[in-house]
Structure formats: structure tokens, C-alpha cells
Amino acid sequence: MSPTLDDQSPMEIRCTEEGAGPGIFRMELGDQRQSISQSQRWCCLQRGCVILGVLGLLAGAGIASWLLVLYLWPAASPSISGTLQEEEMTLNCPGVSREEELLPSLPKTVSFRINGEDLLLQVQVRARPDWLLVCHEGWSPALGMHICKSLGHIRLTQHKAVNLSDIKLNRSQEFAQLSARPGGLVEESWKPSANCPSGRIVSLKCSECGARPLASRIVGGQAVASGRWPWQASVMLGSRHTCGASVLAPHWVVTAAHCMYSFRLSRLSSWRVHAGLVSHGAVRQHQGTMVEKIIPHPLYSAQNHDYDVALLQLRTPINFSDTVGAVCLPAKEQHFPWGSQCWVSGWGHTDPSHTHSSDTLQDTMVPLLSTYLCNSSCMYSGALTHRMLCAGYLDGRADACQGDSGGPLVCPSGDTWHLVGVVSWGRGCAEPNRPGVYAKVAEFLDWIHDTVQVR
């Protein structure tokens, strides 16, 4: 029979220190003290050691955890840089592969530029610091087209020979001659020379792109003025905005393949492309341009949005002006480093909770992030392919959203803007560790040029 509370005094358990040795405890039951035998002392000693050991381990683990948190916790900073974000994610996501950082970057053997009012073609050979004027000997329109495409332009518009006697040159000016090797690579065909035998050099003009004549946020974005992004277009099905697009040439725009795939059963005559719009309220005064042909990338995957680009050929050309123009493609081998400040624009949702697109064009600045970072276990766990890139903030302050798909992600190189990405997909909008994912335009240059040239 168990004693009742009335039968005995309340039990009190407490530990007291016994003897000179610290940490050795004995148990007392209320005031009923008893003498402790030698075996009982030895038992208490063993138990005390066990308790001390456990407490010591717990204390050590606590201190170690505290130091680890102090060491690994990312410091808050208002500025965003690609390096800082990558460091944070590398520390917090063990096992992240840095494979792409280990890939050697090959030095460019030749660079081109078009300089001055005379549009003189210049070449920089084998990393020499000086720019060489190109001699006209051996020149061909095909070579001009190749150079224009390597600079991010869609096509060659004009080329001619210029007499050296008609321009002022520095005495130290040197030239580049084409080698006579048939079938050689363009990048290996240039030879520095002190003069041009014919006394003529090359003037080259490519299709205009990447300029913002009137240039003076999307979630977290701001409304933009007319002409700020002259290549921005709206792809409409009837009177409904479905996706953004970017103007490449008067007859061509590029958008996301998933935009067209979602409405693949729609009649071609129902599609219109509107360029130069800032507000969709002006659509009634803007007839738009009918779509002649929809050309999604042949390898597009609806499962993971790989190869998520499509070209739209227009029935009539877009009229270029101060508020409407083409964006440049990435120049050949052009690299925008992680952390580069780029811009995304569109008419998508301005708040993740909204169900309707914005009536006015929005834009926001986002930094480029490395693919290894976005493929980490903290973000997209390997979902990005080599045809994708991502941009945004780890804290989710600004991002593209529904309705922005197909629109441009552009990055500046001097005063020229290049189409680096096409808005493709993401998980949520402006959520932490969920930046926007874009089709990487540099991976589609050959397909774009081949498609545009043969039609």
C-alpha cells in the first residue's frame, strides 16, 4: 500500500556538496538524514562522475554551437554583391559544386569594334593594347556579317572601303591585314601591319541595337517612362496580355517558348505584338503587328522549361523610332560577371498576391547570380541546366512574376544594352532564396542567327 500524503512529510530532493571534492553530491530525503556507508559513497561517486560528464559534454556542445553560429552567420549588409551572396550560400549549403568556377576561361584572340563617325572597323589582335584599322584587302560581305553577329547585331547593313587619304590618322596608327589562308578561322586571320598596300580601310555598319535615345519596378519595381526600354514588347492573344518579348529586328521578336506552348491551339491570326507601349490602356490606339510565324526552339521541354525561347516572325515590320528599337544580343564570348547589375521589365504582377497583371510597364534592377549558387540545395537543387541563368536577391526584395514571362533581362556594356536572359520560371515571386530563372540567350545565338537569316 502506498503511503498517503497524510502519512508522511512531503519528500524533498536536493543535491548538496559533500567533502572536499567539488562535484560530489549526495541526496537528502527531507530531514530524515542517514549515515552513508563506504559502498554508498562509492555509488554516489560513480553517479556524480556520470552526471558531471554529461553536463560537461552539454556545456561543450553549447559553446561550440555558439562559436559556430558566430563564425558562419552571414553579416547583414545593405549592399548586394555576387561574391557575398555566393560566400553565404557556400557556407550554408554544404556540398555545393563549384565546378564551373574551375573551368579555365580562354583568352580572346581577337576583338572588334566600330569607331567614330566614319564607322571604321578596328580589331585588337592577341591581347595587344592598341586597336588596328582593318585593311580592305581580302574583305568580303560574309566577313562583315560574321563580325556584326559577333558584336551582338542581327545583320550587316553597310560596308565600304575608305581611302586613308580622306581621314586623319595618328602617325603611330597600325593596321591589320587578312591572311591569305583559305578556310582559316576569322579569329586567326589577322596580321598586324605598318600599312595597307591598297591605301584603303574598312568602314562597317551593323543593324542598330541596344541604344536608348530617350533614356534619361514587376515585384518591388517602379513604373517606367516611354522609351526607357525601347525593345520591350507585349505579346497579346486578342486583347489579353500573355507575355513579354524583346525586339531583335523590324520583323523579329524573341519570347519564351512556354508562352506560346501554353496557347499552342490558338489561331495564329489572334496573336499581336505591341512595341512601344508603356500602358496597356493605350492598346486601342495601337493596332499592333500580326504574327506571321511562331518558331519555338525545337528542343524546348515543357517538363523543365529547358530551351525556353521562341522567335516570332512578324507579318509587317515594326517602325523604329526614339521609343521603339532593337536590343543587342550578347556579343560573342561576352561575359557578364556574377553580381552584374542588370534590369528586368514587364507588365507582370506587382505583388505575389495579386491576380491581375500591371497596366503600366514596370522594371527593377537585379544582380546576376552564378548557376552553381542557384543549383545549391538551399535554392533550386540542380534544376538549372546550361541553358539557364538566374538573377535576383537572396532576401527576395525584387523579382519578375506571372505575366513577365518572355520579357527581357538586359545588361549594359558601356552605353549598349544586351539581351542576356528571357524571363522563364521561378518558384513564387520575390521569395527568399528563390531568384528568377531565365533562358540564357548566349546559348541560343547560333539558332537565332540561323533562323533569322534563312527566312
Curated annotation (Swiss-Prot):
Pfam families: SRCR_2, Trypsin. The record marks R217, I218 as: Cleavage. It is an enzyme of class 3 (hydrolase). The chain crosses the membrane at residues 50-70. Disulfide bonds join C135-C196, C148-C206, C209-C328, C243-C259, C342-C411, C374-C390, C401-C429. Its main location: membrane. It is found in: Cell membrane. GO terms for biological process: proteolysis. Keywords: Cell membrane, Disulfide bond, Glycoprotein, Hydrolase, Membrane, Protease, Serine protease, Signal-anchor, Transmembrane, Transmembrane helix. Residues 1-49 are cytoplasmic. GO terms for molecular function: serine-type endopeptidase activity. The active site is at H258, D308, S405. GO terms for cellular component: neuronal cell body; plasma membrane. Residues 71-455 are extracellular. Residues 218-453 form the Peptidase S1 domain. It is a single-pass type II membrane protein. Belongs to the peptidase S1 family. This is Transmembrane protease serine 5. It comes from Mus musculus.
